């Protein structure tokens, strides 16, 4: 995926910046805890393509 596109693309739900995962196969929204797949370098920002991410809750006690 082109770096310029990554700088301007946002989550279609909360409008925050998306980040590439380590394997460069998904775009991640840290606010919504979801990811969107990349198909041949093209982001698929459709609701039916979302993958919900597991989030860890840290207990400070």
From Swiss-Prot:
<dbReference type="Pfam" id="PF03966">
    <property type="entry name" value="Trm112p"/>
</dbReference>
<protein>
    <recommendedName>
        <fullName>UPF0434 protein Bfl377</fullName>
    </recommendedName>
</protein>
<dbReference type="InterPro" id="IPR005651">
    <property type="entry name" value="Trm112-like"/>
</dbReference>
<comment type="similarity">
    <text>Belongs to the UPF0434 family.</text>
</comment>
